Amino acid sequence: MKGLIIIGSAQVGSHTNALSKYLKGQLGEHDVEVEIFDLAEKPIHQLDFAGTTQAVDEIKNNVKSLQNKAMEADFLILGTPNYHGSFSGILKNALDHLNMDHFKMKPVGLICNSGGIVSSEPLSHLRVIVRSLLGIAVPTQIATHDSDYAKLEDGTLYLEDNEFQLRSKLFVDQIVSFVTNSPYEHLK
């Protein structure tokens, strides 16, 4: 079983990244191979059908890599910071390079982090997009706050809150169950 976590934060070492790494560890306990595609480290340009933007080779390679990894994945997790009550623009740019073939009947987990007011609004917006791309957003979603994390001596963030650790377990169990049981495999 393979999964892809797409992190839509512009900040390297973000809270969304820390949550993604935590989930990758939990999925690993189920013998799931998970790759993290962090858009802060692998930028993608906005979609340009007119061809007026000259994308550098690195960005073109990032787009192709994202598309290939999404196609190979049995499930996806979309992670974003809360930007003005919605998901990030860089995640939107990345999603614009994907289509229904990348999502069709695949379970999709939704996660976000807020620095200010805790809000699940970005996840509600992503849920509509996942449905439009024929993906299946799992029922449990995770919306954390900066205060749910602590820092190691080297500054690395980690999920400290026990409640969210339990919620993460339910989230992971749902994704694994959807993939394992494949209730919609015949519709692909």
From Swiss-Prot:
Co-factor requirement: FMN
Kindly indicate where the leader peptide sits in this chain: none
Q: What is this protein called?
A: FMN-dependent NADPH-azoreductase
Described function: Catalyzes the reductive cleavage of azo bond in aromatic azo compounds to the corresponding amines. Requires NADPH, but not NADH, as an electron donor for its activity.
Write out the entry's keywords from A to Z: Flavoprotein, FMN, NADP, Oxidoreductase
Q: Name one GO cellular component term.
A: cytosol
Q: Recorded E.C. number(s)? A: 1.7.-.-
> Which family is this sequence assigned to?
Belongs to the azoreductase type 2 family.
Q: Which residues form a coiled coil?
A: none
Q: What is the uppermost EC class here?
A: oxidoreductase
| Domain of life per record | Bacteria
Q: How does it assemble?
A: Homotetramer.
Q: Which gene encodes it?
A: azo1
Tell me one GO molecular function of this protein: oxidoreductase activity
Q: Which PANTHER family match?
A: CHROMATE REDUCTASE (PTHR30543), NAD(P)H-DEPENDENT FMN REDUCTASE LOT6 (PTHR30543:SF21)
